Amino acid sequence: MLALLCASLMFAPSLDAQTRKTTPKKAPAKTTKKAPAPIVSRIQAEWKCPSELGQGVATGRRFCDVLTARDPKDGILITVPPHRGPVKLIFELHNRHTYSAELIKQKQAYRKYTATIGVLSMDNTLVDRAVVQSEFRTEKDLFDRISGGAGPGGVKAVAPTGDEFITIELPATVVDQVSVLGEKLSVVRPDGTDNFTTTGRPIATISNVMLEFTPAPAPAAPKKAPVRQ
């Protein structure tokens, strides 16, 4: 009886090993490398201004007047560098005000300006419009003063007022330049309202012009000519 019990104990582990199921090891999951995100550049734009207002005293910015016109060649020309996909045109749009301390004393200085401008491609296709509206009551409502004038402190009477941050998406098909043109201006005064659409009139001013885009890939290097033997 004792011998039979010992024999059963000796064979029990081997029987257990035969009946135990082994779980196969899982293969490691395959990892795919993500493509790197495209590099986006944000630069100060190169632009040609047909009507310079001047340099700001407080900001040091270049201010350029937006003229009413119909031909894109007569507008503010902004260079668009080589790119892939759409481009964001970013700038700040201001109204123009002729400052008069005398009108402020007389409580006749109030103005409400609404200026509408357009951004066009060079084939005269409208990309988008932008509007800036602001009110002037006192000198504190001026965005900046412009240096180089005959007024007190050497500043010009005309100054930017109001500030609208504008972002316009240019389609990928725009490859060289865009033009900023004025469309119309409404001025509300204490004694009435004036509307201006005549060609060649400055109706607004812009500053801080930037471009945001994905640069075009570098051109492929030319293939080397085979060496003659």
Regions found by a protein language model. Name each.
Residues 11, 15-42, 218-229:
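Compositionally biased, proline/threonine/alanine/serine-rich low-complexity intrinsically disordered stretches
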Residues 2-12:
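Bacterial N-terminal signal peptides
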